[in-house]
């Protein structure tokens, strides 16, 4: 099925995507916001191949920001380099900046369209076989007025304390360590607080630990996860530059991290929080 273009330039599914709703979606429903660069034709084909079916939620493809193409004026308006250095110990790479701006644009779309909940996905996300059935159960458990994010991708660790049952096979746990922003549910309240806290950009889009520590949002994970990453996602627009930037961090910073992981984390944090590590299953 070929998608149309909205007035804003975003693609939207003709048979399902409603025009700016004045009232929230029905209980158990949500809209999907896909972030994709205009030239990412193969990735967009993957999106349509997964979502262009009767009974699937409405979705729209939002034009992502290519950080490599930003001019100096746009960069100065949307990115705070000094804040990034204070927070991350280094400037963000251009692809990281573009990615973070793209996710903030998705949050603005949520507020403009009065969406109580949205599933934000990057265009290399791979949706699990029964994901939508699980998500329709899950969204009924979420209060849109609370600033909450639920990661649907694989996470590093979760705490076993206070897990909530979603269905016979899935539970919701608090996140302790996670990277990646290619598939997550977000409430309208979380979109609002993240826009206020993260603009101009000063952290990567997937710095969930910072968001939790700063009490900007609460972050949970669905276990087992229901959104993976396609093979084409290995050729990330962000990955290589990010790894090079991470490698440039000071020796002292790495030594402090090593000491924490080797001693404090293993002896105190891990047993106290009953942390569980999650392996890749698909």
Description of each model-found segment:
Residues 2-121, 125-282:
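An acidic/histidine-cluster motif and surrounding catalytic segment
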């Amino acid at each position: 099925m070929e998608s149309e273009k909205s007035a804003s330039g975003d693609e939207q599914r003709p048979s399902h995507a409603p025009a700016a709703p004045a009232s929230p979606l029905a209980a158990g429903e949500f809209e999907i916001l896909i972030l994709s660069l205009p030239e990412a034709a193969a990735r967009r084909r993957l999106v349509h191949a997964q979502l262009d079916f009767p009974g699937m939620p409405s979705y729209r493809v939002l034009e992502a920001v290519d950080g490599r193409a930003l001019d100096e004026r746009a960069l100065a308006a949307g990115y705070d380099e000094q804040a990034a250095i204070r927070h991350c110990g280094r400037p963000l790479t251009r692809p990281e900046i573009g990615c973070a701006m793209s996710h903030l644009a998705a949050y603005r779309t949520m507020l403009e369209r009065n969406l109580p909940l949205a599933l934000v996905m990057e265009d290399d996300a791979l949706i699990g076989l029964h994901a939508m059935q699980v998500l329709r159960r899950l969204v009924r458990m979420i209060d849109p007025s609370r600033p909450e994010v639920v990661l649907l991708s694989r996470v590093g660790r979760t705490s076993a304390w206070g897990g909530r049952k979603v269905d016979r096979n899935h539970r919701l746990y608090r996140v302790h360590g996670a990277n990646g922003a290619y598939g997550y549910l977000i409430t309208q309240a979380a979109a609002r607080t993240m826009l206020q806290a993260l603009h101009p950009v000063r952290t990567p889009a997937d710095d969930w630990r910072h968001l939790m520590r700063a009490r900007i949002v609460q972050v949970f994970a669905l276990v087992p996860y229901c959104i993976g990453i396609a093979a084409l996602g290995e050729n990330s627009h962000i990955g290589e530059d990010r790894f090079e930037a991470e490698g440039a961090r000071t020796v002292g910073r790495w030594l402090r991290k090593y000491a924490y992981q080797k001693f404090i984390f293993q002896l105190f944090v891990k047993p106290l929080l009953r942390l569980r590590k999650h392996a890749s299953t698909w």
